[in-house]
Amino acid sequence: MNAPDSPNALAARSELTDLMQRMGSGAKVASAHMARASAAVKNWALSKLATLLRQNVKALDNANQRDLARAQAAGLAGPLLDRLRLSPKDIETVALGCEQLAAMPDVIGEIIGMKEQPSGIRVGQMRVPIGVFGMIYESRPNVTIEAASLAIKSGNACILRGGSEAIESNKALASLVQQALLDAGLPADAVQLVPTTDREAVGLLIAMPQYVDVIIPRGGKGLIERISREAKVPVIKHLDGNCHVYVDDPCDIDMAVRVADNAKTQKYSPCNASEGLLVARGVAAGFLPKIGAVYAAKGVEMRCDAEARALLAGVAGANLQPVSEQDWYEEYLAPIISIKVVAGIDEAIAHINQYSSHHTDAILTRDHMHAQRFLREVDSASVMVNASTRFADGFEFGLGAEIGISTDKFHARGPVGIEGLTSLKYVVLGNGEVRT
C-alpha cells in the first residue's frame, strides 16, 4: 500500500480527481440535452431499458453472483447480503418500474399556478429538471436502475457511486442503461457509474458544486452522516428507518395481527420495516398473545416492557427480552422488534415523535378521529392508517420508482420520485406591461 503522500499515491489521487472532473463535466453537458429531450424520446429509452433488463437476466445474475461470493468470503452480515442480492424477481420489478415511469405523464415544462396580476402580467411556475444529481449508495444494485430511470424520466443527468460490494452488478446494469440511452439518441453521459471502488471518489463527488446540483445518499447511518457533514452541495437524505406500528383501541384484532406481521417480517432489511410495536392497553390482552405467536413462529426476538412481557409470557417458543431505552431508537434491520403497551393514542403519538426517525409510522384503528389525529400529529414523512409500513416505497406509491426516502422537510419529503428531482422557476407572461 502506498503512503498517503508517496509519489504513487499522489499520482493515483490526481488520476481519480481527473476522472471525477471528466464525469462531472460530461454530466453537466448531458443534463442540457436531457432537459430538452421530448417525453416520447425519454419514454422510449425507458421502455428499451426494460427490454434490455429482461433480455439480460442471466448475465446480470452472473455478475451479482460474483458480488455475492466476494461478499460472503469477506464475512458480510446477513442483512447486507440480502440487500446485495439481485434476483430475477428484483430485475422484473425494476423493469416494471421503468415501464410504469414511461407510462406516467411528463411533468417537465408543466406550468402551475398561473394567475393574472393587477398589473396585467400573468405569473406562474414551470417545473424543470434539477440538472445533475449524484447518487451514493451501498449494496442494493437495484438502486442503479431506479436512479437511472428517474434521471431519464425527469430530464436530469446523474453520477452513480455504488458500494464496492456491488461493483460487478452495478457495472452490468449501468452498461444496459447507457445502451438504452444511446439507442434513444440521448447522451450516454446522462447516466454514469463511477468505475472505481476507491472511497476517495465519494469525497470528490460531494465537493463538485460546479457540476453537481444535489447529492442523494442511500446507505448506513455513518455514510449519510459523513456526506451531510462534508458535502458542498445540498443533500436529500434519511438517516434511519425506525418505523412504528401502533395498535389502537378500538381496532380489528385479526387485521392488526396481519398488518403488524407484514410490517415486521415481510422483509427485515428495508428501511420501511417496522422496528417498534405500540399497543393500546385496552386491546393488549387480546392482541399481544396472537402477534406474539406469529413472531415466535418466525424467530423474531421481542424486546418488551414489563407489561408486554407479562402478556406474552404464555406464548410457546417466544424469545422475550427486556427492552432498554436505546432499543426505542434502534433500527434493527433484523428479526427483532421492541414492544410497548401504552395508555392510548396520546402516549403512542408522543412516543413516536420522541423516538422514531420520522420515516414511516402506522396506526391500526377503527376510530376515525384517532386516525385523523395520527395523520396530523405524527411528525413523519409517511403516515399510514390500517396499512403496513412496508408500503412506504415509490413503486407502491405509484411514483414508478424512487430515488430514496427523505425525512427532511426541504426540498423533498417521503419517497422521492420524479417531482422530487425537479424544481420550480417563475415564468412571467406579459403584453408589453411596464412597472409604474
Swiss-Prot record:
GO terms for biological process: L-proline biosynthetic process. The keyword Oxidoreductase applies. It is found in: Cytoplasm. Belongs to the gamma-glutamyl phosphate reductase family. Keywords: Amino-acid biosynthesis, Cytoplasm, NADP, Oxidoreductase, Proline biosynthesis. This is Gamma-glutamyl phosphate reductase. Signal peptide: none annotated. GO terms for cellular component: cytoplasm. The lineage of its organism: Bacteria, Pseudomonadati, Pseudomonadota, Betaproteobacteria, Burkholderiales. Its EC number is 1.2.1.41. Pathway: Amino-acid biosynthesis; L-proline biosynthesis; L-glutamate 5-semialdehyde from L-glutamate: step 2/2. Its main location: cytoplasm. It catalyses: L-glutamate 5-semialdehyde + phosphate + NADP(+) = L-glutamyl 5-phosphate + NADPH + H(+). It comes from Polaromonas sp. (strain JS666 / ATCC BAA-500). The keyword Electron transport does not apply. PANTHER family: DELTA-1-PYRROLINE-5-CARBOXYLATE SYNTHASE, GLUTAMATE SEMIALDEHYDE DEHYDROGENASE. It holds the Pfam family Aldedh. One of its GO terms (molecular function) is glutamate-5-semialdehyde dehydrogenase activity. Catalyzes the NADPH-dependent reduction of L-glutamate 5-phosphate into L-glutamate 5-semialdehyde and phosphate. The product spontaneously undergoes cyclization to form 1-pyrroline-5-carboxylate.
